[in-house]
């Protein structure tokens, strides 16, 4: 069942304009919907993926390609020389189009054009403000454009962990613990292994980074466990690494370090974060019964009543950040 898309409010649009995210685009999402037919895309094993290759009439396609190349340059500040393909995924909440770009060095890059959803935009903004991950994205009216996030999908990476040595496995487990804590801190849900990627870094200290790639479930669900990646069966391989290779004290130390890092980012980015949370607190981003359920579970989890006055999911996010970091966030805006 697909999640309901929430409209981008006028006040959120003003925020996006202030931070140069809402800007005129050369193409709108709805223009890509005028295809003639699609062909199913199969993986290397001959199985159907959720993606379909879209086919347009030649005249329309010529115009779309020019606009898409202009959009890529606007998004990445790089020049593409051609469009390799345009794919569509009806399965995902945002019903994205995946654009394959041919770059000047004859390499491939991708970006995505999606139907805008306030939940996803809040998720993208919180990712930028509360993690070290930067994501290029643009919005205008009902169109959301995102760059491709490089990395190996978590489910694919799990199939290759046997080639890692014990030290690498331990570092991967530590990265998952940090990711788990980060998602919980900002109430980002549905982080199953196919909704995040593993990035290999050129550093011995921290060779793995886990990055979210799907932000549709930002503070939407009513169950606390859905905001903790450790509880998804798809992530069992990562959880097993952590519980096998790390002791309880090590795990708790990594969680504490991540909370301290988030606290530093809250302080560093307070000028952008404070007004964002102020707007978010007034938005409807989920069904009321889910908010009530999550509010109750958070109170029980922390043995507190600090969440009791919250009436929206945005308020729960703010209180959650305060609860985990000890930093008071003033959202008068």
What are these regions (language model features)?
Residues 1-75, 288-333:
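Regulatory N- and C-terminal appendages and interdomain linkers associated
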Residues 1-7, 89, 102, 135-137, ...:
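A general structural signal for short secondary-structure junctions and capping/turn motifs
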Residues 46-155:
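Conserved ATP-binding subdomain of kinase catalytic cores across diverse folds
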Residues 54-55, 121, 130, 182-192, ...:
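Short secondary-structure transition/capping segments
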Residues 130-131, 142-147, 178-179, 228, ...:
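Short C-terminal domain-edge/linker segments immediately following a structured domain
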Residues 156-163:
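AlphaC helix of the protein kinase catalytic domain
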Residues 164-225:
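Conserved kinase catalytic-core segment
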Residues 204-333:
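C-terminal catalytic region of ATP-dependent kinase domains
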């Amino acid at each position: 069942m697909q999640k309901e898309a929430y409209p981008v409010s006028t006040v959120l649009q003003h925020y996006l304009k202030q931070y140069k995210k809402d800007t005129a685009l050369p193409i709108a999402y709805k223009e890509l919907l005028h295809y003639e037919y699609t062909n199913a895309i199969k993986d290397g094993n001959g199985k159907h993926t959720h993606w379909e290759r879209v086919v347009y009439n030649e005249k329309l396609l010529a115009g779309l390609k020019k606009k898409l190349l202009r959009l890529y340059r606007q998004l990445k500040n790089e020049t593409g020389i051609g469009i390799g393909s345009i794919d569509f995924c009806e399965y995902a909440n945002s019903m994205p189009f995946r654009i394959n770009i041919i770059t000047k060095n004859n390499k491939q890059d991708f970006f995505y054009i999606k139907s805008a959803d306030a939940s996803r935009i809040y998720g993208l903004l919180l990712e930028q403000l509360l993690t070290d991950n930067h994501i290029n994205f643009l919005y205008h009216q009902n169109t959301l454009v995102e760059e491709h996030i490089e990395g190996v999908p978590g489910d694919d990476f799990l199939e290759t962990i046997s080639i890692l040595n014990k030290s690498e496995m331990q570092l991967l487990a530590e990265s998952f613990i940090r990711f788990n804590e980060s998602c919980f801190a900002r109430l980002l849900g549905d982080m199953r292994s196919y909704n995040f990627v593993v990035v290999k870094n050129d550093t011995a200290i921290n060779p793995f980074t886990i990055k979210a790639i799907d932000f549709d479930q930002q503070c939407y669900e009513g169950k606390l466990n859905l905001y903790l990646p450790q509880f998804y069966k798809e992530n069992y391989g990562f959880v097993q690494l952590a519980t096998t290779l790390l002791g309880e004290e090590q795990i708790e130390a990594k969680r504490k370090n991540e909370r301290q890092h988030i606290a530093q980012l809250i302080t560093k980015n307070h000028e952008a974060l404070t007004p964002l949370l102020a707007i978010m607190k007034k938005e409807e981003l989920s069904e009321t019964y889910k908010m009530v359920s999550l509010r109750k579970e958070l109170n029980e989890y922390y043995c507190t009543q600090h969440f009791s006055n919250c009436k929206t999911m945005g308020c729960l996010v703010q209180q959650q950040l305060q609860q985990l970091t000890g930093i008071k966030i003033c959202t008068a805006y």
